[in-house]
Amino acid sequence: MANILFLDNFDSFTYNLVDQFRVLGHNVTIYRNDCDLEKLVETALNTPDTILALSPGPGTPSEAGILLPLIERLKNQVPIIGVCLGHQALIQAFGGKVVHAGEVLHGKVSRISHDNEAMFKDLANPMPVARYHSLMGQDLPKEFIVNAEYNGIIMAIRHRDLPICAFQFHPESILTVQGSQLLQQSIEWLLNR
């Protein structure tokens, strides 16, 4: 069981993701992205089996309160999982770019291809997932491996050395086949890295 410190980037999907983590048996504490950075860092460093979860949200990573500074402070110290905006923020925090995806996607199901490694082990391939985004990561930093993609768009990443993973799509959506299993395998991968 993980103690998930969940950074809410003021998104309507937050509680779906929180509920999914709780159904999987994990403790979840929610912090808004305008909370006190120092207190959250201290909590993260002093809580056993901590995983920092970065939620979806509107806008860009730079507009999301303490999101980027929090990643900078904790990226070498606690496991991190990001979804949608959280995924984009991790790419940006390590030196990549966030750009317009060329289309606005809201509840679009796409069949992503993945590497069947780490978080995706033994999952359907291609895997139907729900996409809700207009931005995407680009120029992926060398520290990351692309786990999954769709038509050249990065759909999932994992860090080569650190316990960090992220998804552009929404694993918590009912439209994502095996999303619950993907989240559980991600938590296990993060804790055992």
From Swiss-Prot:
SUPFAM superfamilies: Class I glutamine amidotransferase-like
Statement: the UniProt record of this protein carries the keyword Lyase: yes
Residues that hold L-glutamine according to the record: 57-59, 88, 134-135
Catalytic activity: chorismate + L-glutamine = anthranilate + pyruvate + L-glutamate + H(+)
Alphabetized GO MF terms: anthranilate phosphoribosyltransferase activity; anthranilate synthase activity
Disulfide bonds: none
GO biological process: L-tryptophan biosynthetic process; phenazine biosynthetic process
Protein name per Swiss-Prot or TrEMBL: Anthranilate synthase component 2
Organism, scientific name: Haemophilus influenzae (strain ATCC 51907 / DSM 11121 / KW20 / Rd)
Gene name linked to the record: trpG
